Amino acid sequence: MSTATELLARTPLLVRRGPYVLAAWAPAQISAVCQGLLRCRTGHGVVILDELEASALLPEHALAEMPPARHVQRGFALITLGTPMEWNVTGVLAAVSGALADAGVPLGAAAAFSRDHLFVPVDRLDDALAALQPLCAEVRVLA
């Protein structure tokens, strides 16, 4: 079993500068939101459904394919922890969020089955990468 430090040390940071948006719809609109993601073929997005809302983190241009959102927050970059996360390892997000908090960088996080995704303000991306780079294997800017 790996420790959080060991796992992060072999993890590349996959960076998409964006801009990304975080948007929210009524839960009943989840089908339309997912259809919009399929139509725009972004390849990158995070969708979460709970009893209060359907939320999505997606490239800003993808909003054109979506039903009107009731809330939109703009100006995010997306950082993906590029190594599959081991579910028995504790402290990965704590280490990442601690480093960003120490640098004063706001953070949102979402987990997929095997990877964690972080979203930070675009204007703080360089600060975020400077804070995270000592923990991780490398930084790869994808877009």
Q: Where are the model-predicted features located?
A:
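Regulatory modules associated with amino-acid/nitrogen control
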Residues: M1-A99, A103, D127-A143
